[in-house]
Amino acid sequence: MLCQKEFNSKRIEKIITYLGTDYLLPVEEILNWNITSEQKLIGKYKSQKAETNYGGRTWIAWFTTELPFADGPYIFNGLPGLIVSIQDSNNEYSFNLIEVKKGGNIFDARTKTVKIDWKKYETLARSYFNDPYDVNSKIRMGKTVTFTGPNGVTMDISIKSKEMQNSILQDNNPIELNHKINYK
């Protein structure tokens, strides 16, 4: 789950890799935080509770003003301090601060990215689901596709594709429930 944040313009984009290409998907939902008076100690930081809705989920965050950052994990930001812990109300996703340390410059080697919207992302995801190993395009180019198991036996590509499809269906619990893809 990678994101690219531009704080001056308040622009946030998810980075999704599909068949070797990095796609930038804009996050356009505004986080409207409800800051409560509830406080607790998280690690060594005095933290305050806040709640918001994002992606069809309710999120409970704990932030601290003891650190000079107003940011958080993934797309989460906009509180008057650093988010040290955040989880959705169903306990399906959680992010927790492990450590704060001074680092060097962060360099991202991505040189070519393609900007897409959620509709295009859904098209790509469905395409991947329907042909997880991109077999059809390889066959059109005159290539053959085979899988060899750990025992050296060649495996049927349709069985491998079905296994991948089952895995996609089993793991189909995105952070953004409002963009969940119904693959059937």
Where are these regions (language model features)?
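Extended soluble regions of mature proteins
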Residues: M1-K184
